[in-house]
């Protein structure tokens, strides 16, 4: 399908070619649904400025509301899990050690599964699709590995309170929310960072991956100074505030699991990226966040990442420069930066050409085939993501999953997608079976009869291949395996 270069007035969707609106929706959402391929004139504006109501169907709302992570605060959950760990440790070396560890591991696994379920249900059914795509993008940008320590007890809250609310807001607020979240602090070992025993791990990743990027002009001395600024920022899983002396008691901060312990902080003055920062405690961290979020290098690096995710693997210097300028003029307003991206000819020309990573492939396939039915079991999707090498919340290193086609277009990946396409196209009844449930579902829709298929400009070779399928399930599989469906 040849995509024309779009006029700059991209927001006037009525002026686009008939097929461009579905392509736009396909790029900025987790995929079109079978009978919802079109886009209204105001759709993009609504996506850039969504309201609080995600418009989830009642069945999805009920599933999310029933989760422990939706009913209990993270602090209560994480402290309870920590107690299970302490009980398991107390039994170490005894005959009951193995059994004593099971409740701890089961609790962590269940909490991770709950977080994954809530995230996928929103991806599948929220009307605010751009926000949900950005929630995945920003989680990947500020990545934490769920299976490290007690992070499985925190990862749902990390996505829900640190990432999602700021996905289309100011970058400074997003950065701050991640800096002060216990999941990030524990993941990058900042609870081990103390005056006289500096741990540079988190400071280095903030500068290298979260803000300025490698080779952007900061020095090793800047990393060391930021590490000093971050001393004392930690996590308290006991539920009991620390005892500190009266002379520093006012400096101590305890907020849920977050803790700033002045006894561990380096109160010496610092020079960070050319800025003098007076030793003052937690305020130093806020000052550093202000400095980092307003660096031209941060604007350029993060704009490049956004362009790679939403446009193309190698965005032009001109596009990145335009986005960077908007960033600096708007003080890091993410929606404004995205507006500049979406209004560009380069973005319009890229529609339909961006290769889907595993998350986009799996979620878009389920949305297309079952977009009008609320699934009862997300485990099959999680299994598919694992098989394709992109488990949800499962990237071990802080760099996050790659965003480029080369990482995901290998022959092994494509073969796995064919197998998954066969399962989804044949009905995937396991999606609609909760634990212990034997209910069956009607067969999937015949995709070739949907509005989506009718609007799709498939090459003749692809249409001919699809018609070779002997059954609707076979034809669904062939569509979901087609080169066109592999792209967005």
Located regions from the model:
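Boundary at the C-terminal end of the N-terminal hydrophobic targeting segment
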Residues: 18-20
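Bacterial N-terminal signal peptides
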Residues: 7-15
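Alpha-helix C-capping/helix-to-loop hinge sites
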Residues: 28-31, 122-123, 141, 145, ...
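N-terminal accessory alpha/beta regions
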Residues: 34-141, 145-156, 162-164
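Amphipathic alpha-helical interaction segments
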Residues: 127, 131, 145-149, 185, ...
């Amino acid at each position: 399908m040849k995509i024309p270069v779009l006029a700059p007035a991209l927001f006037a969707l009525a002026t686009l070619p008939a097929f461009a609106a579905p392509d736009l929706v396909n790029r900025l959402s987790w995929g079109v649904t079978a009978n919802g391929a079109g886009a209204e004139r105001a759709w993009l504006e609504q996506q850039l400025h969504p309201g609080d109501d995600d418009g989830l169907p009642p069945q999805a709302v009920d599933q999310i509301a029933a989760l422990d992570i939706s009913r209990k605060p993270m602090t209560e959950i994480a402290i309870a899990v920590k107690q299970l760990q302490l009980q398991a440790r107390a039994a170490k070396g005894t005959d009951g050690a193995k059994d004593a560890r099971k409740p701890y591991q089961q609790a962590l696994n269940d909490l991770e599964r709950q977080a994954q379920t809530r995230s996928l249900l929103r991806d599948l059914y929220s009307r605010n699709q751009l926000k949900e795509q950005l929630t995945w993008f920003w989680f990947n940008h500020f990545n934490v590995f769920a299976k490290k320590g007690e992070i499985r007890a925190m990862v749902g809250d990390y996505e829900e309170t640190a990432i999602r609310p700021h996905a289309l807001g100011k970058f400074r607020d997003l950065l701050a929310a991640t800096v002060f979240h216990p999941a990030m602090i524990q993941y990058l070992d900042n609870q081990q960072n103390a005056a006289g025993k500096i741990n540079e791990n988190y400071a280095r990743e903030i500068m290298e991956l979260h803000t300025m990027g490698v080779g952007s002009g900061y020095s090793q001395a800047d990393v060391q100074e930021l590490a000093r600024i971050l001393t004392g920022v930690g996590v308290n899983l006991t539920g009991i505030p620390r005892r500190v002396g009266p002379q520093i008691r006012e400096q101590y901060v305890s907020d849920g699991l977050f803790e700033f312990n002045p006894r561990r902080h380096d109160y010496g003055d610092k020079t960070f990226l050319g800025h003098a920062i007076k030793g003052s405690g937690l305020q130093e961290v806020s000052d550093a966040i202000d400095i980092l979020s307003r660096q031209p290098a941060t604007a350029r690096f993060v704009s490049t990442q956004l362009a790679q995710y939403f446009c193309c693997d190698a965005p032009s210097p001109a596009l990145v420069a335009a986005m960077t300028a908007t960033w600096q003029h708007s003080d890091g307003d993410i929606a404004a930066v995205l507006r500049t991206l979406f209004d560009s000819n380069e973005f319009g020309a890229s529609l339909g050409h961006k290769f889907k990573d595993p998350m986009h492939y799996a979620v878009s396939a389920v949305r297309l085939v079952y977009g009008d039915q609320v699934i009862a079991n997300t485990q099959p999707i999680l299994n598919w993501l694992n098989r394709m090498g992109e488990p949800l919340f499962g990237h071990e290193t802080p760099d996050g999953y790659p965003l480029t086609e080369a990482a995901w277009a290998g022959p092994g990946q494509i073969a796995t997608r064919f197998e998954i396409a066969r399962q989804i196209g044949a009905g995937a009844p396991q999606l609609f079976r909760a634990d212990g449930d034997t209910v069956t579902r009607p067969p999937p829709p015949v995709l070739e009869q949907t509005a989506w298929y009718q609007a799709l400009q498939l090459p003749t070779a692809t249409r001919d291949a699809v018609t070779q399928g002997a059954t609707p399930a076979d034809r669904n599989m062939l569509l979901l395996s087609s080169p066109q469906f592999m792209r967005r």
